[in-house]
Amino acid sequence: MKVFLIRHGQTDQNKRGILQGSVDTNLNETGRLQAKLLAQRLLPLDIDQIFCSSMKRCRETIAPYLELKPEVPIVYTDLIRERVYGDLEGMNVVEAKKLLNANHPDHYGEGLSHLTSRLLKFWDEYVVPLQGKKKCVIVLCHGGVINVLRTHFMEEKGFTFDKSKLESKIITFNTSITEIEVTEHGTGHIHTFGDASHLESEETGKLIA
């Protein structure tokens, strides 16, 4: 079974470098365009099931695809909402990282262990039962969520991956796709990290971001 972990489209806060966390923001104009390009990217796939964060920026990202394929079942869930960052929310990302580095990461908002438990609860309750039964599943969520799941799969569950793809820093672009293949026994292989090729402009070759 293939599982595509997809980040939401761009928001004004993303563009300005503001940490959103649990703040329920909308897509901006660029984000809405990214969502339409993502829909075209997903259209050829035979998608069995979609799981989507209940936050607006994720709902708005998957909406163009659902307009084209309304028959695909979707579940909106709080379990894959972005991490709660407490007092850091609304701050510049660079400044927020300085505070995180200066203090214990769990000092602000939702602790990493709690976040990981929440995400694994989602995986165990929603994704694991589909292993060996479905062929293609979409998980539309957040950058922080994808990073935690990816790290857990690589370091704790032993999912294999092409190490050459990790030679440079992984950037989880807006609407980028991380493709994972999971067997019915729970083993897996990560095929792509943050693939945003659908955002490449035909005129400039640069990402629409």
From Swiss-Prot:
Q: What is its main location?
A: cytoplasm
A GO BP entry is:
positive regulation of pentose-phosphate shunt
Q: Which domain of life is it from?
A: Eukaryota
Protein name per the record: Probable phosphatase C1687.21
Q: Which GO terms describe its molecular function?
A: fructose-2,6-bisphosphate 2-phosphatase activity; phosphatase activity
Species of origin: Schizosaccharomyces pombe (strain 972 / ATCC 24843) (Fission yeast)
Q: What is the lineage of its organism?
A: Eukaryota, Fungi, Dikarya, Ascomycota, Taphrinomycotina
InterPro entries found in the cross-reference section:
His_Pase_superF_clade-1 (IPR013078), His_PPase_superfam (IPR029033), PG/BPGM_mutase_AS (IPR001345), Phosphoglycerate_Mutase (IPR051695)
Subcellular location(s) of the protein: Cytoplasm; Nucleus
Q: SMART domains this protein is in?
A: PGAM
